[in-house]
């Protein structure tokens, strides 16, 4: 990460906004027009259902108690993480890393909005093979965060120091 302003910052912020909006719009579609109710389910295919889940905690049901203390602690912690990711994005010179950070930022903000509005995060995407469910029920924000983290890890492992050099904007002297 450089101390110079990222040449991809505007792009990253737009990308984060799109991720955030996709998350919020899909949650609205599932809860309002489709009228999916808490603990309700709509079977779309043999491997994908829309299943309403109210997630008071974080992944794998950690911190799942639905208390005000848990709610506001998770809002604060997620807000701090989102601020750190946004700051990192302002300095990141590699376009691929900015995309990954934007996904994480947009997803984090989407889940923060849910937690502030409802006290829980609305999850609805239920991928399964018969009765086998390899994933927890999730939402677009969760998918964005996961994909963003995996992109950062993959780029760090596969490209290493070359990541910033490979897709950074060339400087004009």
Curated annotation (Swiss-Prot):
It is a multi-pass membrane protein. One of its GO terms (molecular function) is aspartic-type endopeptidase activity. The chain crosses the membrane at residues 11-31, 69-89, 93-113, 134-154. It catalyses: Release of signal peptides from bacterial membrane prolipoproteins. Hydrolyzes -Xaa-Yaa-Zaa-|-(S,diacylglyceryl)Cys-, in which Xaa is hydrophobic (preferably Leu), and Yaa (Ala or Ser) and Zaa (Gly or Ala) have small, neutral side chains. Pathway: Protein modification; lipoprotein biosynthesis (signal peptide cleavage). It is found in: Cell inner membrane. GO terms for biological process: proteolysis. The active site is at residues 123, 142. It comes from Sphingopyxis alaskensis (strain DSM 13593 / LMG 18877 / RB2256). One of its GO terms (cellular component) is plasma membrane. Its EC number is 3.4.23.36. Its main location: membrane. This protein specifically catalyzes the removal of signal peptides from prolipoproteins. This is Lipoprotein signal peptidase. Keywords: Aspartyl protease, Cell inner membrane, Cell membrane, Hydrolase, Membrane, Protease, Transmembrane, Transmembrane helix. Pfam families: Peptidase_A8 (PF01252). The keyword Protease applies.
């Amino acid at each position: 990460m450089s101390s110079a302003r990222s040449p991809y910052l505007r792009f990253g912020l737009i990308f984060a906004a799109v991720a955030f909006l996709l998350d919020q719009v899909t949650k609205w579609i599932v809860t309002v027009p489709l009228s999916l109710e808490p603990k309700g389910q709509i079977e779309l295919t043999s491997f994908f259902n829309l299943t309403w889940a109210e997630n008071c905690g974080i992944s794998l049901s950690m911190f799942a108690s639905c208390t005000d203390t848990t709610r506001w602690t998770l809002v604060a912690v997620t807000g701090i993480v989102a601020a750190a990711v946004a700051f990192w994005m302002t300095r990141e010179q590699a376009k691929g890393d900015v995309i990954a950070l934007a996904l994480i930022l947009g997803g984090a903000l989407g889940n923060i909005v849910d937690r502030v509005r409802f006290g829980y995060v609305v999850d609805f995407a239920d991928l399964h093979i018969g009765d086998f469910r390899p994933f927890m029920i999730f939402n677009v924000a969760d998918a964005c965060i996961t994909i963003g983290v995996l992109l950062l890890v993959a780029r760090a492992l596969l490209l290493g120091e070359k990541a910033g050099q490979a897709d950074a904007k060339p400087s004009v002297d």
